[in-house]
Amino acid sequence: MRALGIDVGVRKGLDLVLLDGERAVLDTARHVDVDDLHKLVPDFGPDVVAIDAPPAWASSGRSRLTERELRWFGVQCFNTPSDPEMADHPFYEWMTIGFQAFRAIEDAFPRYRTGSVRGQAIEVFPHATAVVLSGFLPPKGLSPHAWRREVLRSHAVDASALRSADQVDAALAALTGLFALERRFSAPGDPREGKIVLPAATLPARPYRRATAPAK
């Protein structure tokens, strides 16, 4: 069982991390051009591809249902608008790269909508993954990068093999893919506009609380 996580970047390129069923880091790639994904991804031999970006614009309004549902749990995320003209806005450039990533591999890994994730490309959000796996929002006073590394370590991923924050996010994406392959996942939202996959079969009845800062 293998899951490939992809962290999306604009000028820096994409970061890829491949995890196996034992959560070992099997391979990585840095600064990958989105146009090379269709050749590179099959070479990794993943059972699922987890991309840290939405697959398309919202169907209407200023955000997608999946993003609104995440915020109900206290997990803040960027909105994906429905207006394609927003593609010209510099802020949304990373989203358009994400759209391209989904399209680049859709022949081998079609976009996930419902059912099993095996052989699919799923949307993930590393921050949300870390919240769900830890059970808390990140504590104040601890950098997001350090917190996410700790979440990986607490779930048996050797974060020492990861050289950057982008690789950490790609590893969290891949870890989400492993949970999804094991059918331990939730995917709130509307499949027509994309659903963020979370690494838990059930979600809490109340919003997540913030973790207590570690003692100094």
Pin down the residues of each PLM region.
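Phosphate- and other anionic-substrate recognition elements at nucleic-acid/protein interfaces
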Residues: 1-216
